[in-house]
């Protein structure tokens, strides 16, 4: 199995590492395992990326820019924020490692233009081989029901109407009986989520085409299949326009994007909706991997290899067994997430 390495170089205003530190780590890892790509971002420092890219290209490894889309980018350039169905602007639902989870409107043309403008201004000269688009979604249940029920601006309302959904009806149903609205057999919820997934996919298609026209590969960061529809991610639709997807199969992360964590936020928001307890064990992981079969692009699911006692208490056995399940499923590879700079060598494939 082949690997993608992920490194969080820092937010918009503060670097986490120097080029020398990153190169030192990559020179430890790349000779010991088959690496296809390295994803780096999003601190804006073209000199750093050119320096790292020179080493990667000498070793036949592609370098991709890690670029946030509907969250984070608004900290760097002005963007139109998302609002809920009741007209309230959504704030940041959670924050970690300098990351901001305040989301922006997914249909606003100016927001989409900002993504390509920032690439051209801050990164185009760094000789990236591709771009890895993150936050290609709405807010999750971490922001409460209101986060999932977004965006409710007039432009988004028009987009939903084109897909046969009246957002006023959705808001009224949620106000009347939130548990009933969020139940798995709710027809209105299904129609809302189907429309939201199409709306998000239409916007991401615009970005994919724009970056592919620049000769760049495009990868997308996506939620695990269990929770992806709630944040507007149809994996079949997104896979049509991407070169690869990285479903975040994070079973040991107690923070946004962690599968169990996100699922429990759903149950907290709608405790009477009938969602059962789940165990995110290896049988569950196999079912999530099975859900990726047949999608029309390459799959490099993500496994959290870094360890943080507070939010990601991973260990070598968890990583080893997860990667074995990935390999057995037949996916193209795995993304070692979300920052190999923080991962113990014991969590790396060459240690197993």
PLM features per residue range, with description:
Residues 15-48, 125-130, 240, 244, ...:
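Catalytic domains of carbohydrate-active enzymes, especially glycoside hydrolases
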Residues 53-54, 62-126, 205, 340:
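Active-site-adjacent "subsite" loops/lids of carbohydrate-active enzymes
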Residues 242, 246-260, 278-291, 295-352:
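Substrate-binding cleft of secreted/luminal carbohydrate-active enzymes
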Residues 1-25, 306:
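Boundary/entry segment of secreted carbohydrate-active catalytic domains
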Residues 24-29, 35-84, 188-215:
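Aromatic-lined substrate-binding rim segments of carbohydrate-active enzymes
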Residues 3-7, 38-40, 63-67, 129-134, ...:
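Hydrophobic faces of well-ordered beta-strands that scaffold small-molecule active sites
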Residues 96-282:
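Polysaccharide-binding and catalytic clefts of secreted carbohydrate-active enzymes
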Residues 8-12, 43, 68-72, 135-138, ...:
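Active-site beta-loop-alpha junctions enriched in small/polar residues
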